């Protein structure tokens, strides 16, 4: 049940008509990329960073330069699974007063660019907003679904029910430490794609692509026909090409945020984001025909009771992008 605060916030967010991407999900994007013999490029930024309009302009630049799917981060005051780069951006957004209704407005704006928009959020803000209200308002805004990295498989039943009723993708995470039974349960609960967080530790750009990423993708594909997208801190085109050679999707977040943090001003930062997106897109497209094994058509894989956390059965807390 939605809380009064969530209901009030939701009423503000649902004004207007749904964006063009409403309930479209990510399946079509993966299918088109697979037909082209390449992986999908997924880009993340927190809503409201570097500013309310600046984030929308940055998303636009990313899509224009070749990002296929956008992750709109919902800022949260306790981002324990994120590294210092993303935490700095999230702090900036929160200081600017960005809240869930603003994230939904950002999703509406981004969906107009033609790329599916997923909300990346810790579970607490969604629960406080109201699970059904959030699903309804996200669909109305044109959102494709949500990635919920800290939502455990045992506690996600309400979210799965609400998301399914609004035809939203539900993306959960697997990690190298996840045992086979956990990977299977997570995969049966995903719709759209499976997020493979292949590097232990908090988020952040990495200097090299390890073998664990490819092994995790292979293990995950033993349990699902859904596409498998990898987040491990990719920071350049060469790394994107490496990951695209074995995964259905390449997820990049910290590197985009770093470009904005390091820029002398917002306009320069957006240009840097666009340049990075173009470099990453070229890398992804340079691995044509290599990203096989996943069913890039997407869809729902089975009917598990709930989605899962990346860590499955271990005690670490991490999400990599």
Where in this protein do the model-derived segments appear?
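Alpha/beta catalytic cores of nucleotide-metabolism and tRNA/nucleoside-modifying enzymes
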Residues: 1-3, 218-226, 235-245, 249-293, ...
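Active-site-adjacent beta->alpha loops and helix N-cap segments on the catalytic face
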Residues: 22-33, 52, 77-86, 95-105, ...
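Catalytic cores of alpha/beta
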Residues: 53-62, 178-188, 230, 234-250
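Active-site beta->alpha loop and helix N-cap motifs at the rims of alpha/beta catalytic domains
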Residues: 69, 74, 87-150, 284
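Alpha-helix-loop-beta-strand connector modules within alpha/beta enzyme cores
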Residues: 83-118, 161-175, 211-228, 272-288
């Amino acid at each position: 049940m939605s809380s009064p605060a969530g209901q009030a916030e939701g009423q503000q967010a649902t004004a207007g008509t749904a964006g063009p991407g409403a309930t479209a999900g990510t399946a079509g994007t993966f299918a088109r990329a697979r037909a082209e013999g390449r992986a999908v490029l997924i880009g993340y930024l927190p809503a409201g960073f570097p500013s309310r309009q600046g984030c929308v302009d940055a998303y636009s630049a990313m899509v224009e330069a070749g990002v296929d799917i956008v992750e709109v981060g919902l800022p949260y005051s306790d981002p324990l699974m994120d590294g210092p780069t993303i935490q700095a951006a999230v702090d900036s957004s929160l200081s600017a007063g960005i809240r869930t209704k603003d994230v939904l407005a950002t999703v509406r704006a981004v969906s107009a660019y033609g790329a599916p928009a997923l909300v990346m959020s810790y579970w607490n803000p969604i629960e406080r907003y109201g699970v059904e209200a959030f699903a309804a308002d996200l669909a109305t805004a044109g959102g494709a679904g949500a990635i919920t990295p800290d939502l455990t498989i045992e506690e996600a039943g309400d979210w799965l029910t609400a998301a399914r009723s609004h035809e939203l993708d539900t993306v959960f995470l697997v990690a190298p430490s996840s045992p086979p039974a956990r990977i299977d349960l997570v995969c049966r609960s995903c719709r759209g794609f499976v997020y493979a967080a292949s590097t232990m530790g908090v988020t952040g750009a990495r200097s090299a692509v390890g073998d664990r990423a490819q092994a995790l993708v292979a293990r995950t594909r033993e349990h699902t026909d859904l596409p498998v997208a990898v987040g491990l801190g990719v920071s350049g085109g060469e790394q994107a090409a490496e990951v695209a050679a074995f995964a259905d999707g390449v997820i990049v977040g910290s590197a985009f945020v770093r470009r904005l943090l390091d820029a002398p001003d917002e306009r320069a930062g957006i240009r840097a984001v666009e340049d990075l997106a173009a470099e990453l897109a070229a890398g992804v497209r340079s691995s044509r025909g290599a990203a096989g094994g996943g069913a890039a058509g997407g869809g729902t894989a089975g009917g598990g009771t709930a989605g899962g956390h990346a860590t499955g059965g271990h005690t670490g807390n991490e999400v990599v992008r």
